């Protein structure tokens, strides 16, 4: 085995940083840039409620299905090439959505985007593990912060761009970042794996690894944590404005500002949480903070919504700090590249697989009871569900260690 050229390693890592940042930005901006433009799009062609409902359901569905398939794609085509195809699908979908001539074209473009995002979500922790195994906390901070920025930025500027240049430009402008992100991954995909980066685990991937995740407590704990974070986030993005209007008596405009506050709370968490987990080993205290905040936030909206809606929303928005915690833990709770991909795929596909029923389930429950009591109680229960998962993750065992203790050699 030849010794890697230090200059080639350095260049590979620089390309990887740029690629990871642009990938992370595209994974969230593609999701967050559409809904503010429905009114503007509706002036050009009809947007049936059924199609809008499908567009709202497609993201978690695609994240679950394609997250499940991502490990197989990576085994077959390799990490860089799979990343390249996923990001290409996002870029192509953004262009297709901007060029849509009817609601079904919009749906097709969105489905293509979310399929790429579903695969990309799984691959990002594996990319960090491969290229920056000794800097997992730092790189996770970089890309989760990028994700946080690209979540709240598009809704803020989508309408102004549409007013100035049209809704097609407002949708299509985000494709620039996806296309730019293709460049480093093309270079890294073409380069030999042996020369792409140092300290890379190149063992032959095993098709059995993903199947083992179903039998490991840490894998299930991460899946439950991912579900708790994504369920609260997606339910809030879908229903929090209406909950606030109905229960706290705020105006729709104020409710929109409060929803932005909910999203903005994730930014400081993305800056701090990965470092606390990777460098300090702080895990269970973060779970306690997140769980307690979720209980207090949903509980406040339940028993005294009008007294301090800003406080309740800020508290509820604290629970998704579990998202960067999960992404950091995926790299820290594995020894091998293959296990990292499998664990990321398992946690995200299971988490999103259950989450996709939350927004529509909350809507059905509200219609059946004509009240927000039951949905808020469910959010309290989900917040509490994270605590036992935190106890398991705090044990600091890798999935390989768990398997070896229970079943013998990995």
Label each residue range with its predicted role.
Residues 109-147:
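Cytoplasmic helix-loop-helix junction between adjacent transmembrane helices
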């Amino acid at each position: 085995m030849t010794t890697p050229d230090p200059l080639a390693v350095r260049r590979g890592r620089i390309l990887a940083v740029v690629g990871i940042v642009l990938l992370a930005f595209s994974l969230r901006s593609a999701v967050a840039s559409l809904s503010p433009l429905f009114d503007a799009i509706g002036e050009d062609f009809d947007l049936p409620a059924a199609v809008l409902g499908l567009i709202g359901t497609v993201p978690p569905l695609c994240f679950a299905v394609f997250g499940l398939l991502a490990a197989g794609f990576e085994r077959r085509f390799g990490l860089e090439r799979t990343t390249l195809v996923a990001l290409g699908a996002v870029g192509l979908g953004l262009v297709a959505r901007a060029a849509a001539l009817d609601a079904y074209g919009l749906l097709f473009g969105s489905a293509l985007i979310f399929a790429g995002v579903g695969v990309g979500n799984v691959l990002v922790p594996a990319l960090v593990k491969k290229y920056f195994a000794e800097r997992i906390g730092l790189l996770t901070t970089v890309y989760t912060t990028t994700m946080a920025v690209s979540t709240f930025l598009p809704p803020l500027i989508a309408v102004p761009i549409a007013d100035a240049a049209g809704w097609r430009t407002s949708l299509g402008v985000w494709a620039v970042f996806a296309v730019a992100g293709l460049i480093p991954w093309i270079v890294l995909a073409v380069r030999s794996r042996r020369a792409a980066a140092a300290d890379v685990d190149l063992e032959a991937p095993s098709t059995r690894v993903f199947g083992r995740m179903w039998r490991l407590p840490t894998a299930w704990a991460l899946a439950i944590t991912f579900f708790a974070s994504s369920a609260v986030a997606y339910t809030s993005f879908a229903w929090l404005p209406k909950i606030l209007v109905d229960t706290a008596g705020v105006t729709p405009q104020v409710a929109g500002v409060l929803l932005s506050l909910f999203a903005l709370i994730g930014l400081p968490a993305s800056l701090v949480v990965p470092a606390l987990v990777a460098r300090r080993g702080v895990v269970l205290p973060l779970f306690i903070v997140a769980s307690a905040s979720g209980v207090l936030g949903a509980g406040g909206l339940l028993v005294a919504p009008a007294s301090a809606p800003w406080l309740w929303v800020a508290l509820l928005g604290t629970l998704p700090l579990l998202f960067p915690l999960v992404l950091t833990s995926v790299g820290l709770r594995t020894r091998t590249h293959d296990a990292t991909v499998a664990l990321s795929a398992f946690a995200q596909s299971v988490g999103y697989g259950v989450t996709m029923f939350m927004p529509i389930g909350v809507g059905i429950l509200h219609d059946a009871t004509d009240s927000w009591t039951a949905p808020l109680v469910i959010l309290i229960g989900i917040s509490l569900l994270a605590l036992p998962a935190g106890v398991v993750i705090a044990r600091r065992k890798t999935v390989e260690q768990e398997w070896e203790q229970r079943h013998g050699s990995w």
